[in-house]
Amino acid sequence: MKGEWTAAAYAALYDRVVDGFPPYEHLVDSVAGLIERLNLKDRRPAPCRILDVTCGTGSVVRRLAARGHVVVGADPIVPLVERARRANRRGSSCCFYAIDVAHQEVPEIESFDAVVSMHTLYWHPEPARVLNACRRALRPGGHAIVLTYSRPAAVVPVARAVWQAEGMRAALQSLRWLIPTAAFELARGGPHLYLPPAELARLLCEHGLEPLGSDAVFLGGISQLTWSRRLPCSTSPETRRESSLPRQR
């Protein structure tokens, strides 16, 4: 019951936080541009077919669809998916499923040019299964774009880092994200998994994804954006040891 209440409250607040929030909009545009460049490099026809594995209220899905791509959003939290569906315009090239990709198969596996995971691994109780799902959803040679926190989004340290890098105005602006995120994390509880670049690259390799590049991004570099390619594997990644994942904390 507490989890449902927290999710419903988060759904009501989330869009107000991200809509018109320049750092987040810049981040999503960067992800979209990266997908388009990778697809062009592979000489694949436009538009791209994209899966967002934990789409939340669908803000990323809608922005990608607005650029002309065909996008599927999946999320295990029903109130978030319901809000995403209500916000979706008729005729839009996107759709939403209330499923947990760690346990339920995404429609049309091995058909997506790109899979997007936005801040999923640090909170999901089974991150290894999420990475396996990303690989299964991709066409051969398709790309996984994984964004995850490399350190906690602590209000004071992150705002201070933004101030030092970008000035007072940007630091004050960052509070729009940091304060609601801190409140949500306090209400949600549970373990967290923060992955430095080398650790994330290792996990991607272990689950059939070849890292191609990585950048520290978003609010003073608290997040790691890594892009990778689906590897052909003679051994199914699902058979690999999931115990190699570091403990969430």
Label for each model-derived stretch:
Residues A128-P140:
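A short glycine-rich, Lys/Arg-flanked "PGG" loop and its adjoining helix->strand segment in the class I
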Residues L51, T57-H103:
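Class I SAM-dependent methyltransferase SAM/SAH-binding core
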Residues M1-P45, S59, I145-Q173, P180-F184, F218:
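Conserved class I S-adenosyl-L-methionine
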Residues V106-V115:
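A short acidic, Gly/Pro-enriched loop at the edge of an enzyme's catalytic core
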Residues P191-H207:
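Short alpha-helix
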Residues A114-E126:
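A short SAM/SAH-binding and catalytic strip from SAM-dependent methyltransferases
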Residues H207-L209, D215-E242, P246-R249:
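Core SAM-dependent methyltransferase catalytic element
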